[in-house]
Swiss-Prot record:
A motif (Internalization motif) lies at residues 868-871. It comes from Infectious laryngotracheitis virus (strain SA-2) (ILTV). This is Envelope glycoprotein B. Residues 694-748, 724-744 are annotated as: Hydrophobic membrane proximal region. It is found in: Virion membrane; Host cell membrane; Host endosome membrane; Host Golgi apparatus membrane.
């Protein structure tokens, strides 16, 4: 609501005020609640109407000229009888605007959103394996192949590293469902000390065991392996909501730094299997640089595909905070406005606006540090500056300011004011009640974001709006103080002018009361009050002006005002005239008064003057009389108008709260580039490890899902029997898959291919030898079975006995050879007989077994013949068959 006051005052009194008011262009509120006198326009009043009460602004409001014009209305006024009286108001107390401002002094601590990442120390354990193949031919070696990889170190070896500072030269690792071993320089395993690396930075230190690899030999190919055990001290960084962290090496670990298995609340984020994560209590770590053993702490270990990482276990609420202290303000002022508080920070030239309800800080997630930090800062400021002059008033209050700033405010009260307050409370026999603190439940701002674990304050990146708020508040305070002074001066001026009006009512009460009421009235002074009667409007056609202003019968006397004859109209208003209604058509003698008023009677006379020239207002125009005779009618526009009216439109500046306008959010600024570094690094690390889950290799699907689905089908449809059958199916499938996987792995090995090639060549050679033996057996079985029994072809015949001198000796030698040959033949026949007999028995047993199995599957009933045992094959029958 806006109210304006326009009052006609003299030029000299407001010459200074004009210059000030021209500069004030901001609209606000100004109301004046003056009380005065006015009409009670009831149609049941008498001819002289009683005066009721109207406001002073209503009385003088009609005097503000919208456009300079003269009303074409004429009124007839009767002499007041005293039935309606009025009085002028007394001077009033002038209010000062500055007295209404409620200010509270105190100490403020301003918090902002903590956008800094959480930084903590980690230790990286891994073995760097390098396999190099070189070629040399009595010349400089050439590298033909190189393979580099990193493998994690198991927990038991990490314990040895942290205790003794030594690491093994052997690396055992698992890749593609197989275990591998690597040895440094292809030598036997040994313990090597960890020595500092020359490559260091402010955020990382490294220790390793070797930097030398035997890469070549003088002649031929050489494949050499080096195993370097590396331990790195790094800084890791994690940002809210702390679901992963990154290291200076560029590696990212997809687990929260606050992850723990033993927790009662919701578990933190992790994509690793439980067996990869270890929590060790009272673990001691040796500083490899100084050799000192650190105090025991709870230690976390995580085994990744390429490294093992260790860090100290931490409590999330004790380690991180979503808010951080921005500034401390020893002299802060809280100004109370209609709907908000303004916290003015004079030293920082900033002002923050907030709601009037304190903010419930327990709603914030990970903001337990705020009360502690605020209390420590306020205690320090109070002890240094206010302990001897002020006392604290109430507890620390928190307010959420515009732009996402949390304000901790401690109210202060001077010793003198506090003593007066206590004395007043004791006098009233009760202690002062503190203002009830209400929580701002449900109050939402653009700076407060809700989450599953609690709310979080997001702070605007710029505080320019707070500086603008401070500037506006300073200008507002200055302008409002100036306007307050103007209003006070205006009030005092009205009081002084009221004294003048009291004196004017004694001289010309008609003009005074007409100007106050804004309409023609007739007034007469009755002691200290004024009798007032209302004037009746006379239509201009009911008025007849006379041309001469001379008094009939006396040539020396003339009328000072033009004379006229008028009559009241037949309108309902005529009933309020002094004449009766039945005489309304009779002419009434009168004179033209000031401001289009008709004076009943012709009592205003004066001695006639020479060169008389007068202008009298009638309706909208003026009547010109010269030598007391009407000359002509003059238009009002022909006469230059001089106005002394000055408008005073004093407006107080409104309360205005500046809010931050963020053109580009942080997310938009972060996404302005083509690539997002965090997303690229995380994707690259995940792609290099080739996992969907950290332990599920993409190419490691062996078809288990199909057989598992079959087993579930049996279990769901056949019940317990189906579950047992499904277990059998899964077992058989696992055996088949393992066999096939083993064969596939064997065939994929290059040594297996070489072994298979050698086996094929050996088999071919053995086959050719067997084929040659069979062909020789078919062509000459006696020679093959009994070598030497028959002389080979081309052997000269044995000489006859006649060529020998000693015939008896020759005959004896021949008989001996025959006996030896016969013995060999008999032994060979005996062996053949035994082999045939053995084969016949095996055949008979197999036939009986096959017959029994057929009867068993066919469920053939037993007969009496089946109860008799088979007769054994007699030995004499076998001998007869042989014969």
């Amino acid at each position: 609501m806006q109210s304006y006051i326009a009052v006609n005052i003299d030029m000299a009194s407001l010459k200074m005020l004009i210059c000030v008011c021209v500069a004030i262009l901001i609209p606000s509120t100004l109301s004046q609640d003056s009380h005065g006198i006015g009409w009670n326009n009831s149609p049941h009043d008498t001819a002289s109407m009683d005066v009721g009460k109207i406001s002073f602004s209503e009385a003088i409001g009609s005097g503000a000229p919208k456009e300079p014009q003269i009303r074409n209305r004429i009124f007839a006024c009767s002499s007041p009888t005293g039935a309606s009286v009025a009085r002028l108001a007394q001077p009033r107390h002038c209010h000062r605007h500055a007295d209404s401002t409620n200010m509270t002094e105190g100490i403020a601590v301003v918090f902002k959103q903590n956008i800094a990442p959480y930084v903590f120390n980690v230790t990286l354990y891994y073995k760097h394996i390098t396999t190099v193949t070189t070629w040399a031919l009595f010349s400089r070696p050439q590298i033909t192949n190189e393979y580099v990889t990193r493998v994690p170190i198991d927990y038991h070896e990490i314990v040895r590293i942290d205790r003794s500072g030594e690491c093994s030269s052997k690396a055992t690792y698992h890749k593609n469902f197989m275990f591998f071993e690597a040895y440094d320089n292809d030598e036997a395993e040994k313990k090597l000390p960890l020595v500092p690396s020359l490559l260091r930075s402010t955020v990382s230190k490294a220790f390793h065991t070797t930097n030398f690899t035997k890469r070549h030999q003088t002649l031929g190919y050489r494949t050499s392996t080096s195993v370097d055990c590396v331990v790195e001290y790094l800084q890791a960084r994690s940002v809210y909501p702390y679901d992963y962290f990154g290291m200076a090496t560029g590696d990212t670990v997809e687990i929260s730094p606050f992850y723990t298995k033993n927790t009662t609340g919701p578990r933190r984020h992790s994509v690793y299997r439980d067996y990869r994560f270890l929590e060790i209590a009272n673990y001691q770590v040796r500083d490899l640089e100084t050799g000192q053993i650190r105090p025991p702490k709870k230690r976390n270990f995580l085994t990744d595909e390429q490294f093992t990482i260790g860090w100290d276990a931490m409590e999330e609420k004790e380690s991180v905070c979503t808010l951080s202290k921005w500034i401390e303000v020893p002299e802060a002022v809280r100004v109370s406005y209609k709907n908000s508080y303004h916290f003015s920070l004079k030293d920082m030239t900033m002002t923050f606006s907030s709601g009037k309800q304190p903010f419930n800080i327990s709603r914030l997630h990970l903001a337990e540090c705020v009360p502690t930090i605020a209390s420590e800062a306020i205690d320090g400021i109070f002890a240094r500056k206010y302990s001897s002059t002020h006392v604290r008033s109430g507890d620390i209050e928190y307010y959420l300011g515009s732009g996402g700033f949390l304000i901790a405010f401690q109210k202060l009260m001077s010793h003198g004011l506090a003593e007066m307050y206590l004395e007043e409370a004791q006098r009233q026999n009760h202690l002062p009640r503190g203002r009830e603190r209400r929580q701002a439940a449900g109050r939402r701002t653009a700076s407060l974001q809700s989450g599953p674990q609690g709310d979080r304050i997001t702070t605007h990146s710029s505080a320019t709006f707070a500086m603008l708020q401070f500037a506006y508040d300073k200008i507002q305070a200055h302008v409002n103080e100036l306007i307050g002074n103007l209003l006070e001066a205006w009030c005092e001026l009205q009081n002084r002018q009221l004294i003048v009006w009291h004196e004017m009512k004694k001289l010309n009460p008609n003009s005074l009361m007409t100007s106050l009421f804004g309409q023609p009235v007739s007034a007469r002074l009755l002691g200290d009050i004024v009798a007032v009667s209302k004037c009746i409007e006379i239509p201009i056609e009911n008025i007849r002006m006379q041309d001469s202003m001379r008094v009939p019968g006396d040539p020396t006397m003339c009328y000072t005002r033009p004379v006229l004859i008028f009559r009241y109209s037949s309108s309902p208003e005529s009933q309020f005239s002094a004449n009766s209604t039945e005489n309304h058509n009779l002419g009434i003698l009168g004179q033209l008064g000031e401001h289009n008023e008709i004076l009943q009677g012709r009592n205003l006379i004066e001695p006639c003057m020479i060169n008389h020239r007068r202008y009298f207002l009638l309706g909208e125009n003026y009547l010109l009389y010269e030598d007391y005779t009407f000359v002509r009618q003059v238009n009002a526009s022909e006469i230059e108008e001089v106005s002394t009216f000055i408008n005073l439109n004093a407006t107080i500046l409104e309360d205005l709260d500046f809010v931050p306008v963020e053109v580009y959010t942080r997310e938009e600024l972060r996404d302005t580039g083509t690539l997002n570094y965090d997303d690229v690094v995380r994707y690259q690390n995940i792609y290099n490890k080739r996992f969907r889950d950290i332990d599920t290799v993409i190419r490691g699907d062996r078809g288990d899902a199909i057989f598992r689905a079959i087993a579930d089908f049996f279990g769901n449809t056949l019940g317990e029997v189906g579950k047992a059958l499904g277990t059998v199916v899964m077992t058989a499938a696992a055996a088949v898959i393992s066999t096939v996987s083993g064969i596939a792995s064997f065939l994929s090995n290059p040594f297996a291919a070489l072994a298979i090639g050698i086996a094929v060549v050996v088999s071919i050679i053995l086959g050719l030898l067997a084929f040659k033996y069979v062909m020789n057996l078919k062509s000459n079985p006696v020679q093959v079975l009994f070598p030497g029994a028959v002389p080979p072809a081309g052997t000269p015949p044995r000489p006859s006995r006649r060529y020998y001198k000693d015939e008896e000796e020759v005959e004896e030698d021949s008989d001996e050879d025959d006996r030896i040959l016969a013995t060999r033949v008999l032994k060979g026949l005996e062996l053949l007989h035994k082999d045939e007999q053995k084969a016949r028995r095996q055949k008979a047993r197999f036939s009986a077994f096959a017959k029994n199995m057929r009867n068993l599957f066919r469920r053939k009933p037993r007969t009496k013949e089946d109860d008799y045992p088979l007769l054994e094959y007699p030995s004499w029958a076998e001998e007869s068959e042989d014969e």
